[in-house]
Amino acid sequence: MCGNPAVGNGTRALILVGGYGTRLRPLTLSTPKPLVEFANKPILLHQLEALVDAGCRQVILAVSYRAEQMEKELKVEAKKLGVELIFSHETEPLGTAGPLALAKTILAASSEPFFVLNSDVICDFPFKQLVQFHCNHGKEGTIVVTKVEEPSKYGVVLYDENGCIKNFIEKPQEFVSNKINAGIYIFNPSVLDRIEVKPTSIEKEVFPEMTQQQELYAMDLTGFWMDIGQPKDFLTGMCLYLSSLRQKQSPKLYTGPGVVGNVLVDPTAKIGEGCRIGPNVTIGPDVVIEDGVCIKRSTILKGAIVRSHSWLDSCIVGWRSTVGRWVRIEGITVLGEDVIVKDELYINGGQVLPHKSIAASVPEPQIIM
């Protein structure tokens, strides 16, 4: 790979899929988080497509939770993409580094560098640039860093003008940097000698040692980035993704009567008359939107129905859920799978578990079980 900047067929990647997806409940009570649709496509499929586009032919999924469902659904997609998917099963949670050691025989089978990424990340994936940057500096690892508005919420990365990382500072109270770890890495196989098959944090246990030895570099990400592991960030990420689509692939966006701004609609969805859809809306397969509905900054998942004259803002409507007539939903409300909201109700910030029927308004954010 480093001999050939055009990323060869020897490229491999490991995606950290492990966790239970608790931050994205109630959606993840029905579906493993990597299979939840983001902009009408499973989160993980965005990453797989970007890896394949960069020449990757083998992807290891480090899984622990509901692996069978993922295998079943992803094998079909992998075949279409022409990528070999290997499932590496954790019997106990191994953190962010342990899964690399568990997959060591596969990752060390070639001397070429390999990608590692966190399954919650959506961005303009820079895999080709990352390979070139990594090969140019010739050290053991490179992490992608991205600029954020509020660095005090994160651990920040300090590095010199060449990209050589000098330090990591966890949630700084005073401004030292606004660059954070974006959860996308490339490593030489020699990094595997630093990791054992046990619960290990790559950020807290492996990176500091590599930094001390000047073996870890940072590459700046251009374009948008979001960790979409929780509903608020899922919706923000959707807005950023649709904006990127507008710049790069605008024909994919929906244009029709009543559409405002960036909207993505599956061809099988039906939208009634007198609706106002957008900005920043995704509507999935087999969705029915009746007449006079207003939707903005929301995701409507497969098979959901929104009855006439309802108003939705900043919400996620789960698979096969039904929103009644003259309903108002806002405040980062998430309806799980197969939820029924009766007519003329108000829901503000509700997290509604699957298969529930809501017959009274929910004026304050709460979990409805």
From Swiss-Prot:
<dbReference type="InterPro" id="IPR005835">
    <property type="entry name" value="NTP_transferase_dom"/>
</dbReference>
<keyword id="KW-0548">Nucleotidyltransferase</keyword>
<dbReference type="GO" id="GO:0035167">
    <property type="term" value="P:larval lymph gland hemopoiesis"/>
</dbReference>
<dbReference type="GO" id="GO:0005737">
    <property type="term" value="C:cytoplasm"/>
</dbReference>
<feature type="binding site">
    <location>
        <position position="227"/>
    </location>
    <ligand>
        <name>GDP-alpha-D-mannose</name>
    </ligand>
</feature>
<dbReference type="GO" id="GO:0120508">
    <property type="term" value="C:GDP-mannose pyrophosphorylase complex"/>
</dbReference>
<protein>
    <recommendedName>
        <fullName>Mannose-1-phosphate guanylyltransferase catalytic subunit beta</fullName>
        <ecNumber>2.7.7.13</ecNumber>
    </recommendedName>
</protein>
<keyword id="KW-0460">Magnesium</keyword>
<comment type="function">
    <text>Catalytic subunit of the GMPPA-GMPPB mannose-1-phosphate guanylyltransferase complex. Catalyzes the formation of GDP-mannose, an essential precursor of glycan moieties of glycoproteins and glycolipids. Can catalyze the reverse reaction in vitro. Together with GMPPA regulates GDP-alpha-D-mannose levels.</text>
</comment>
<comment type="pathway">
    <text>Nucleotide-sugar biosynthesis; GDP-alpha-D-mannose biosynthesis; GDP-alpha-D-mannose from alpha-D-mannose 1-phosphate (GTP route): step 1/1.</text>
</comment>
<feature type="binding site">
    <location>
        <position position="227"/>
    </location>
    <ligand>
        <name>Mg(2+)</name>
    </ligand>
</feature>
<dbReference type="InterPro" id="IPR056729">
    <property type="entry name" value="GMPPB_C"/>
</dbReference>
<feature type="region of interest" description="Substrate-binding domain">
    <location>
        <begin position="12"/>
        <end position="231"/>
    </location>
</feature>
<dbReference type="GO" id="GO:0006486">
    <property type="term" value="P:protein glycosylation"/>
</dbReference>
<keyword id="KW-0547">Nucleotide-binding</keyword>
<dbReference type="Pfam" id="PF00483">
    <property type="entry name" value="NTP_transferase"/>
</dbReference>
<feature type="binding site">
    <location>
        <position position="120"/>
    </location>
    <ligand>
        <name>Mg(2+)</name>
    </ligand>
</feature>
<dbReference type="Pfam" id="PF25087">
    <property type="entry name" value="GMPPB_C"/>
</dbReference>
<feature type="binding site">
    <location>
        <position position="120"/>
    </location>
    <ligand>
        <name>GDP-alpha-D-mannose</name>
    </ligand>
</feature>
<feature type="active site">
    <location>
        <position position="171"/>
    </location>
</feature>
<keyword id="KW-0342">GTP-binding</keyword>
<dbReference type="GO" id="GO:0004475">
    <property type="term" value="F:mannose-1-phosphate guanylyltransferase (GTP) activity"/>
</dbReference>
<dbReference type="InterPro" id="IPR029044">
    <property type="entry name" value="Nucleotide-diphossugar_trans"/>
</dbReference>
<dbReference type="InterPro" id="IPR018357">
    <property type="entry name" value="Hexapep_transf_CS"/>
</dbReference>
<comment type="subunit">
    <text>Component of the GMPPA-GMPPB mannose-1-phosphate guanylyltransferase complex composed of 4 Gmppa subunits and 8 Gmppb subunits; the complex is organized into three layers, a central layer made up of 2 Gmppa dimers sandwiched between two layers each made up of 2 Gmppb dimers. Gmppb catalytic activity is reduced when part of the complex and binding of GDP-alpha-D-Mannose by Gmppa induces allosteric feedback inhibition of Gmppb.</text>
</comment>
<dbReference type="InterPro" id="IPR045233">
    <property type="entry name" value="GMPPB_N"/>
</dbReference>
<comment type="similarity">
    <text>Belongs to the transferase hexapeptide repeat family.</text>
</comment>
<keyword id="KW-0808">Transferase</keyword>
<dbReference type="InterPro" id="IPR050486">
    <property type="entry name" value="Mannose-1P_guanyltransferase"/>
</dbReference>
<keyword id="KW-0479">Metal-binding</keyword>
<dbReference type="GO" id="GO:0005525">
    <property type="term" value="F:GTP binding"/>
</dbReference>
<dbReference type="GO" id="GO:0009298">
    <property type="term" value="P:GDP-mannose biosynthetic process"/>
</dbReference>
<dbReference type="GO" id="GO:0046872">
    <property type="term" value="F:metal ion binding"/>
</dbReference>
<feature type="region of interest" description="Hexapeptide repeat domain">
    <location>
        <begin position="254"/>
        <end position="369"/>
    </location>
</feature>
